[in-house]
């Protein structure tokens, strides 16, 4: 029987990106070992390829990804990719499992990515085509933010989601 859903550990990406502390690569490796030894998740979002100035917490994400793939070959490691520039970097460095993000709220999308929703949709389409063309059996997942309410614009009308 096929699973209806997969669980993802996002500690090393979502958990660290809001931290005031900037973790070293060795500290991130220790966190990875702790997660693997205690929980052994099959799917892990290991980091994000973003500007080091915008999110210094995600520094060394590519190095951590490569380390994780080598150390734990039975797990699936994902990288959150916000745009085509960082997608090309990820593909060129062997990333094959991708997390993408968009929003239902134009206001949230502009604040989060500096792009309007229509531009984000075009960018995502371009990114997915790029992955399909340049990777062998890539796995892609999409985060959809603000499906009920936006912290900036308030309640989201259900018709916009459909």
Language-model features, listed with the residues they occupy:
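Short, well-ordered coil/turn segments that N-cap beta-strands
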Residues: 2-5, 40-42, 72-77, 94-96, ...
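Active-site mouth loops of central-metabolism enzymes
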Residues: 8-29, 75-84, 109-116, 146-160
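Non-cysteine beta-strand/loop elements that form the S-adenosyl-L-methionine
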Residues: 8-10, 96-106, 140-145
């Amino acid at each position: 029987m096929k699973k209806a859903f997969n669980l993802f550990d996002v500690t090393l990406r979502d958990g660290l990106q809001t931290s005031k502390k900037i973790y070293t690569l060795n500290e991130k490796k220790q966190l990875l070992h702790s997660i693997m030894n205690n929980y052994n998740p099959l799917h892990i979002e290991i980091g994000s390829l973003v500007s080091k100035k915008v999110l210094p917490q995600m520094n060394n994400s590519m190095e951590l990804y490569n380390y994780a793939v080598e150390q734990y070959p039975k797990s699936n490691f994902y990288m959150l990719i916000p745009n085509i520039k960082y997608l090309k970097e990820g593909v060129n460095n062997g990333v094959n499992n991708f997390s993408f993000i968009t929003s239902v709220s134009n206001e949230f999308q502009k604040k989060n990515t500096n792009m309007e929703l229509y531009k984000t949709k075009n960018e995502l389409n371009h990114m997915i085509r790029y992955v399909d063309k340049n990777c062998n059996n890539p796995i892609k997942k999409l985060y959809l933010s603000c499906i009920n309410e936006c912290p900036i614009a308030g309640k989201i009308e259900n018709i916009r989601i459909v």
